[in-house]
C-alpha cells in the first residue's frame, strides 16, 4: 500500500490523463493545513480542488463538490481513490444515500458498493457528502481506526446562510476533514482549466478565506491593552507559520512571544516562556486562554508538574483541575512546559478532535547548547508544535511593554507576508509594511528547516520562494551595484542563502557558471593533532557554482572535521548598505567519507579542525577545485610563486608562515614578486607579540588577517581571523611601508587577540591595553619610536591628557583609551617591558580571578607592585583607581617609587589650588 504522500499521489493519479469535470457546479477551494495532507488536483490559479490525507490508521480523499463524486467522467480517478482508501482488497465499500448513484459508477467499473446510512466496523471505504451533521464522531472514529473516507462537498451555500467566517470551524464537512488537515473554504474554485500533475502539485502560500481568528484574538486579549515583558525571564521568539495560527504578543520588530492556533476541532495557546503563563500580571490573559481552549467542552484541565502553580494562581476559578504528566482522553485542556516525552501522534489527535493545549517554554537555551541542530525539527517541543502551525525558535524577543495586536489590522504572518511579497514582485500588489522584509528573512530560515520530509504545507513555501528568485534573477551586489538593507534585493539575497542552506541545488539559484579548470590531480592535505582549533589552508579555491568532492578515511568521519568555503566570515546583515553579499562563507560537516561541496559565492577552501582534535595524520583529499596563489615561508619557491600568480584565476590568495597567514586579493599579490622578506618581517612582528603576551612561540595556531570589501565594523577588527578593509592592503604587503610607517592598526588588533579578562577592565582598558603591543612591535621590531608610531602619542598631547584628567578630579569614567593607556606607559617608561611580560605570564597561572573591575584593578596594583618591588598604591590612586585600604596597607612595607611621574602633576595641581 502507498503510505507516503508521493506514493499515494502516484496511486491516486495512475492512468489519469485529464480532469473531465462537470462545468456547472461551483467547487469550494480547499485549504490544507495538516502535515499529512497533500493536493491532488489544482487549477490554473493554484487552487486545490481535490486533496488527500492520512489520519490515525486511516485515509481521506476530499473533493471540492459532491457532484464530482457522481460524475462518470471522473471514474478513473474515483476508482483509484477507492482502491487507495481501502485498507485491504476484500474490505467492503459503502456509500451514503446522498451519493447513491456513485454505486452504479463504481459497479460499471467492476467495484461493488452498497448504500449504508453510516460506516460500520468491517467496512473498508465509506463515501459521503460533506453536509451530514449527525455522523461527525462516527466518521472520525472510522478513519482513525483504519477506514478510508471519500467525501465531497462545497461550503459556498452554507456560508451564505451561516456566515462566511464560521466555515472553517463549523461547516459540517470541516468538522470531519479538518482533523486530517483539510478544509472546505468559502472561496469559489475557478473551473476554466485544470492541471494534470505528474507529481504532487504546489500549494498557494496563503488562502484568503474568512476565518474566526479575528474573534478568537479578541476573546483571548479581552481586557488587555499591553504585554509587559520588561522584567523576568526573557521569552523565546515564536514562529507563527500555520494558516490558522495567529500572534497575541509581539515586540516592536514583529517578533512574536505569545500565539494561538486552531487545529482541526481543537485549539492551542503557546507562550515563549512559562513565566508568561504563571505570572500574576498575566492572570486576565490566562483566564481568557483557558476559557477559549475549553470551547464547548466540560472536562478537566490537566496540569503537568511545572504548571501546577496555575491552580493556586486561579483559586477562585470554576475549572476542574487534574494534576497529571499524562495526556489522557478525559481531559479537555492540557497545560505543560514540555511535550518531548509525549507521543506526537497522540497529542496531534487530542487537539484535532477538540482538545486544548496550553504550552509555555523557551528554546534559546536549547539553541545555545545545540548550535548545529535544527530548531524547528529537533527541539523536542517543536516536533509536536509545528504540526499546529507554531514553533519556538532559538532567538529571544526584545524587552519592553508592547501593545496587544489589533484584530482589525493585518498582523504580520510569514505566509501572508511572503504571499504579499510574491504579489509585489509580480506587480500585482502594494508594498509590504515597513520592517516586514527583515522579519521575513529570519522566519524563512526557520521555515525552511521543515522542508526535508516531503510535507506539502512546508515544501510549497520553499517552492514559491525559489520561483521568486528564478523570476527576478539572482541578485548581484558590488561596489557599482550596492544593495540597501531592507530592500527587495536584500531580501532576495537572504532568501537565496536560506534556500541554499535548506538543500536547494545551486543550479536552481545561479545562472550557469563560467567553469574554471580544476587542478589536474586531486590535492591531499594532512591533518594532525597540531592543527586543533584552527583553519588549515588548502591552497585551493572553489569558484561560485562549481562542485568539488572532499574525501577522507571512514575512521575520520566522527572527528568533527569541517570544510569552510570562503574566509570572509563577517556577517554584515546589519549594515545599511551592502557592497558584497551579507554572508560570504559556508560550512560543510565532513560526516561521511565523501562529501560534495559548492557555494553560491565560491571561496578559498579550508579544513576546520575542532578543539581537542586527537586523530593524527588524516588525509583529506579535494578534487574539482582550482589552485589559488599560496606562498608558504620556507616551502614555496620563488619560481613556484611566480607560476601561481601568473596563471591562477582565483581572485584570492594567501601568504603564510607558521605563525601568521595573510589573505589578500590576487590582483594585489601579482605585484609581489618575492614574498620572502615580507613574511620574515611578519614573523618577527608576531614573535614580538607573543613575547610581550608571554605566549609560546611558534604559535600553536597561526594568527590570520583577512582583507575584505566590507566588514562588520571599523576598518579593522580583532578575532580569528582579524578582518580588515582592502584599502589597507598596501600597508600589509609592502615591506618598505611597514618598516617606514609602521603597522599600528594590525598590531592593535593582534593586541586585542592577546588581551585577557583577568587584567582587562571593561570598558576602561578595552581599547587601551591592546596598544601596548603596537608600541612594543614598533619600537622593538620596526625601530619606530612611540611618538612617531601614532600621532596620539605626541609628548605634549600626552602631558595635556594627564593634566586634563587630573583637573577633572581623576574620575574613573574619564579613564579610557589614550588616557588609560598613559597609566601603563608611565609604568613601562619607569620599569621597562619585563614586568609586563612577567605579569602576563603570572596571570596565566592564577585561578579564581575576580570578576568585577574594582577587585581586578586592586589585584593588578598588588601584583605589579610585587614584581617591581615598589609600593605603587600612591601612583594608581593618583590616576583615580579605587585602591582598597587593605591592598594599600599590604604594600606599605615596599619602598616608595621615588620616580613616580604623577608626583609632578599632583604637585602642579596643588600649586594651582593654593
Curated annotation (Swiss-Prot):
Pfam families: M60-like_N (PF17291), Peptidase_M60 (PF13402). GO terms for molecular function: transmembrane transporter binding. Residues 533-832 form the Peptidase M60 domain. PROSITE patterns: PEPTIDASE_M60. One of its GO terms (cellular component) is plasma membrane. This is TRPM8 channel-associated factor 3. SMART domains: M60-like. May play a role in the regulation of the cation channel TRPM8 activity. Belongs to the TCAF family. The lineage of its organism: Eukaryota, Metazoa, Chordata, Craniata, Vertebrata. It comes from the Eukaryota.
Amino acid at each position: 500500500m502507498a503510505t507516503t504522500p508521493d506514493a499515494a499521489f502516484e496511486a491516486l493519479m495512475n492512468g489519469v490523463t485529464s480532469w473531465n469535470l462537470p462545468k456547472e457546479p461551483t467547487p469550494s477551494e480547499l485549504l490544507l493545513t495538516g502535515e499529512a495532507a497533500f493536493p491532488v488536483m489544482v487549477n490554473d490559479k493554484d487552487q486545490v480542488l481535490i486533496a488527500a490525507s492520512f489520519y490515525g490508521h486511516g485515509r481521506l480523499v476530499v473533493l471540492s463538490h459532491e457532484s464530482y463524486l457522481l460524475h462518470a467522467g471522473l471514474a478513473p480517478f474515483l476508482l483509484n481513490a477507492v482502491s487507495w482508501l481501502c485498507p485491504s482488497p476484500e474490505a467492503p465499500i459503502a456509500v451514503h444515500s446522498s451519493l447513491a448513484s456513485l454505486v452504479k459508477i463504481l459497479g460499471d467499473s467492476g467495484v461493488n458498493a452498497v448504500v449504508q446510512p453510516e460506516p460500520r466496523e468491517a467496512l473498508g471505504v465509506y463515501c459521503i457528502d460533506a453536509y451530514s451533521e449527525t455522523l461527525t464522531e462516527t466518521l472520525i472514529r472510522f478513519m482513525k481506526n483504519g477506514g478510508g473516507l471519500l467525501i465531497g462537498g462545497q461550503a459556498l451555500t452554507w456560508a451564505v446562510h451561516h456566515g462566511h467566517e464560521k466555515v472553517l470551524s463549523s461547516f459540517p464537512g470541516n468538522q470531519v476533514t479538518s482533523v486530517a488537515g483539510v478544509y472546505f473554504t468559502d472561496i469559489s474554485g475557478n473551473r476554466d482549466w485544470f492541471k494534470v500533475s505528474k507529481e504532487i502539485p504546489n500549494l498557494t502560500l496563503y488562502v484568503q478565506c474568512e476565518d474566526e481568528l479575528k474573534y478568537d484574538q479578541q476573546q483571548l486579549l479581552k481586557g488587555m491593552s499591553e504585554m509587559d515583558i520588561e522584567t523576568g525571564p526573557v521569552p523565546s521568539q515564536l514562529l507563527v507559520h500555520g494558516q490558522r495560527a495567529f500572534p497575541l504578543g509581539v515586540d516592536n520588530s514583529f517578533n512574536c512571544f505569545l500565539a494561538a492556533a486552531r487545529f482541526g476541532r481543537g485549539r492551542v495557546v503557546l507562550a515563549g516562556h512559562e513565566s508568561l503563563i504563571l505570572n500574576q500580571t498575566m492572570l486576565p490573559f490566562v483566564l481568557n486562554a483557558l476559557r477559549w481552549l475549553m470551547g464547548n467542552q466540560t472536562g478537566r484541565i490537566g496540569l503537568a508538574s511545572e504548571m501546577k502553580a496555575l491552580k493556586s494562581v486561579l483559586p477562585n476559578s470554576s475549572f476542574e483541575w487534574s494534576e497529571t504528566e499524562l495526556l489522557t482522553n478525559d481531559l479537555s485542556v492540557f497545560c505543560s512546559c514540555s511535550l518531548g516525552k509525549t507521543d506526537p501522534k497522540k497529542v496531534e489527535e487530542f487537539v484535532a478532535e477538540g482538545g486544548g493545549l496550553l504550552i509555555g517554554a523557551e528554546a534559546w537555551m536549547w539553541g545555545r547548547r545545540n548550535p548545529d541542530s535544527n530548531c524547528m525539527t529537533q527541539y523536542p517541543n517543536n516536533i509536536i508544535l509545528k504540526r499546529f502551525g507554531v514553533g519556538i525558535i532559538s532567538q529571544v524577543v526584545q524587552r519592553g511593554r508592547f501593545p496587544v495586536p489589533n484584530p482589525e489590522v493585518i498582523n504580520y504572518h510569514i505566509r501572508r507576508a511572503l504571499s504579499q511579497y510574491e504579489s509585489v514582485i509580480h506587480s500585482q500588489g502594494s508594498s509590504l509594511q515597513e520592517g516586514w522584509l527583515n522579519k521575513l528573512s529570519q522566519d524563512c530560515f526557520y521555515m525552511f528547516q521543515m522542508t526535508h520530509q516531503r510535507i506539502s504545507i512546508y515544501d510549497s513555501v520553499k517552492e514559491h520562494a525559489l520561483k521568486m528568485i528564478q523570476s527576478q534573477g539572482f541578485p548581484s551586489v558590488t561596489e557599482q551595484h550596492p544593495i540597501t538593507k531592507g530592500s527587495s534585493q536584500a531580501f532576495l539575497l537572504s532568501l537565496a542563502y536560506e534556500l541554499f542552506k535548506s538543500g536547494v541545488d545551486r543550479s536552481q539559484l545561479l545562472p550557469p557558471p563560467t567553469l574554471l579548470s580544476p587542478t589536474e590531480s586531486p590535492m591531499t592535505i594532512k591533518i594532525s593533532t597540531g592543527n586543533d582549533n584552527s583553519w588549515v589552508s588548502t591552497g585551493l579555491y572553489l569558484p561560485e557554482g562549481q562542485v568539488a568532492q572532499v574525501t577522507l578515511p571512514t575512521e575520520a568521519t566522527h572527528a568533527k572535521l569541517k570544510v569552510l568555503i570562503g574566509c570572509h566570515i563577517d556577517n554584515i546583515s546589519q549594515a545599511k548598505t551592502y557592497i558584497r553579499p551579507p554572508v560570504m562563507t559556508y560550512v560543510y560537516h565532513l560526516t561521511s567519507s565523501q562529501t560534495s561541496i559548492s557555494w553560491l559565492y565560491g571561496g578559498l577552501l579550508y579544513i576546520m579542525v575542532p578543539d581537542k582534535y586527537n586523530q593524527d595524520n588524516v588525509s583529506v583529499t579535494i578534487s574539482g577545485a582550482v589552485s589559488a596563489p599560496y606562498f608558504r615561508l620556507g616551502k614555496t619557491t620563488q619560481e613556484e610563486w611566480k607560476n601561481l600568480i601568473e596563471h591562477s584565476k582565483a581572485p584570492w590568495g594567501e601568504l603564510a608562515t607558521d605563525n601568521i597567514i595573510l589573505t589578500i586579493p590576487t590582483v594585489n599579490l601579482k605585484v609581489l614578486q618575492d614574498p620572502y622578506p615580507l613574511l620574515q618581517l611578519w614573523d618577527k612582528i608576531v614573535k614580538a607579540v607573543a613575547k610581550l603576551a608571554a605566549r609560546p612561540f611558534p604559535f600553536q595556531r597561526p594568527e590570520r588577517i583577512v582583507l575584505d570589501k566590507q566588514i562588520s565594523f571599523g576598518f579593522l577588527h580583532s578575532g580569528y581571523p582579524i578582518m580588515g578593509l582592502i584599502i589597507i592592503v598596501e600597508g600589509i604587503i609592502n615591506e618598505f611601508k611597514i618598516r617606514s610607517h609602521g603597522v599600528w592598526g594590525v598590531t592593535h588588533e593582534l593586541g586585542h587577540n592577546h588581551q585577557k579578562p583577568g587584567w582587562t577592565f571593561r570598558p576602561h582598558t578595552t581599547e587601551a591595553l591592546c596598544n601596548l603591543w603596537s608600541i612594543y612591535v614598533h619600537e622593538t621590531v620596526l625601530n619606530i619610536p612611540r611618538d612617531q608610531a601614532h600621532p596620539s602619542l605626541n609628548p605634549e598631547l600626552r602631558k595635556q591628557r594627564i593634566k586634563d584628567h587630573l583637573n577633572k578630579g581623576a574620575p574613573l569614567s574619564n579613564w579610557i583609551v589614550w588616557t588609560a593607556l598613559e597609566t601603563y606607559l608611565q609604568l613601562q617608561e619607569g620599569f621597562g617591558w619585563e614586568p609586563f611580560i612577567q605579569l602576563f605570564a603570572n596571570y596565566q597561572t592564577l585561578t579564581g580571578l575576580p570578576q568585577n573591575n574594582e577587585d581586578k584593578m586592586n589585584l593588578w596594583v598588588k601584583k605589579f607592585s610585587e614584581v617591581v618591588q615598589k609600593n605603587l598604591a600612591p601612583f594608581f590612586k593618583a590616576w583615580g583607581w579605587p585602591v582598597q585600604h587593605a591592598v594599600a596597607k599590604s604594600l606599605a612595607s615596599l619602598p616608595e617609587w621615588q620616580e613616580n611621574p604623577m608626583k609632578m602633576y599632583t604637585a602642579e595641581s596643588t600649586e594651582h589650588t593654593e
